[in-house]
């Protein structure tokens, strides 16, 4: 797209070597599971996004190939190919083989750059069995090839001249090393969600994704940027005002962009980004926004006598944010990330800048749009009334201490251990299964809480109504960390919550209701990795005195073929946990030596918010459309 040559070998700064990457990949990409695998793609795409932020690229193509490789193509300036003085090698080779070698560390080339770990394509190269690069710049097409991170001798070559009018740019194609990654199969949906998010955050950049394996493809281009992001998140919700509120500003080299829209939902949905990185743990930009938002709303409400119903109280932040969908995006030349997963923005100066911008621009917006201000404040006042009503009920559910066993629910069969790190709570569907679980468990560290029937769908109710539900109250009390904004994970009595429901449609529904409760009102449990779904076997196969358990039909068929010579004595399908006796339940589902647990994680909070709203919210239309779109993907249906 651009012929600007300020980006050359001289701008490539080298910080350290690559030796340790293959030995300790998790240090560089977070993990070697599916999340780490997809992070390789994000690292390469981030380089293209940096070119876009610098104004040199407006199209990025990601392709999943049938041979298991991925290619990322952009129309930026192309990676420099001239000789690097320090190394006496092409800059392209240095970038691909030396950790932290790149123009990101030279502010002349990139004022702002993304990349959570910021490790660059050299790490992608180190963790790939093979990598190929094609660069179009300096009037020619250049190629290079690497194997296990090593440049191949005489593989760097000038292939041909650029055609007149042909775009500059870079294509990187890599094959992840299956000796390092637990899986090398890329998931289209995971990449699609992240690339859609990047397109929203970088208006005017077209990002496409294609999958040769399935012929699926998606293209994203959002001229409206984060305005359109908020509209997308609110597609399934009823907005309280027509237009998305949007403002942006720049101060001290830091760009601030904020979009928001209030809805009649009970759950808020605020997503904060720094240099395109989803800061799931929040940070100074989010704190600044929340502080200013609450102050602006209260200032306007008090000036216009709108808080008379609250007995002299002001609105709290949680009241103002109820049903609010917002996206905060900042671009910082030197972001500092902290927190457990390095997804919390730590730059102290950002808070004041975001606060000031929001106070000034949102305050002005309210004065110029009184109808919108009134709609937002009326909703917040309603939320404050409900909060006060919920306060009394909430007190009943809060545990005095994480280690006390007084006033626990009568139906809870608690464990002997008082150490949350070794304690686990099985949340079991039905009294009959609960009885088997209580008898089959290891009392030292396993607690059992049977739930009767289906709990309330919390997506449709405020906290005061939720806390009237006996089963939910028992669950909150048993967990011990409180609920809602005041939930304290340090007070949780168990560090493993295991949802154990039947392997049928009703069981799946109960599990979904429980996950909705945990996601909306005790989300830190999911974010900390404390929540699991038990995976009880679906089938038991007997043959000549031997017993085999199968998790699904494919495993059942394999056992019948390989272990039973195609002629089993008996095949039993477990319809419910209650059909298993205590010993069977222990052996198959509860014994840490044998069991299979599925950890519940949230990769993408915006996508999760939207999905919970579609599946569990009030609007029927989006749910109906979702079912139509995905009916063919259903693995089993009870009719």
Swiss-Prot record:
Binds two Mg(2+) per subunit. The magnesium ions form salt bridges with both the protein and the DNA. Can also accept other divalent metal cations, such as Mn(2+) or Ca(2+). Residues 392-416 are annotated as: Disordered. One of its GO terms (cellular component) is chromosome. It is found in: Cytoplasm. Mg(2+) 1 binds at residues 429, 502. The keyword Ubl conjugation applies. PROSITE patterns: TOPOISOMERASE_II, TOPRIM. InterPro entries: DNA_gyrase_B_C, GyrB, HATPase_C_sf, Ribosomal_Su5_D2-typ_SF, Ribsml_uS5_D2-typ_fold_subgr, Topo_IIA, Topo_IIA-like_dom_sf, Topo_IIA_B. Residues 392-402 have a biased composition (Basic and acidic residues). GO terms for molecular function: ATP binding; DNA binding; DNA topoisomerase type II (double strand cut, ATP-hydrolyzing) activity; metal ion binding. It catalyses: ATP-dependent breakage, passage and rejoining of double-stranded DNA. The keyword 4Fe-4S does not apply. It comes from the Archaea. It is an enzyme of class 5 (isomerase). Its cofactor is Mg(2+); Mn(2+); Ca(2+). Keywords: ATP-binding, Cytoplasm, DNA-binding, Isomerase, Isopeptide bond, Magnesium, Metal-binding, Nucleotide-binding, Topoisomerase, Ubl conjugation. There is a cross-link at residue 624 (Glycyl lysine isopeptide (Lys-Gly) (interchain with G-Cter in SAMP2)). Mg(2+) 2 binds at residues 502, 504. Heterotetramer, composed of two GyrA and two GyrB chains. In the heterotetramer, GyrA contains the active site tyrosine that forms a transient covalent intermediate with DNA, while GyrB binds cofactors and catalyzes ATP hydrolysis. Belongs to the type II topoisomerase GyrB family. A type II topoisomerase that negatively supercoils closed circular double-stranded (ds) DNA in an ATP-dependent manner to modulate DNA topology and maintain chromosomes in an underwound state. Negative supercoiling favors strand separation, and DNA replication, transcription, recombination and repair, all of which involve strand separation. Also able to catalyze the interconversion of other topological isomers of dsDNA rings, including catenanes and knotted rings. Type II topoisomerases break and join 2 DNA strands simultaneously in an ATP-dependent manner. Few gyrases are as efficient as E.coli at forming negative supercoils. Not all organisms have 2 type II topoisomerases; in organisms with a single type II topoisomerase this enzyme also has to decatenate newly replicated chromosomes. This is DNA gyrase subunit B. It comes from Haloferax volcanii (strain ATCC 29605 / DSM 3757 / JCM 8879 / NBRC 14742 / NCIMB 2012 / VKM B-1768 / DS2). The gene is gyrB.
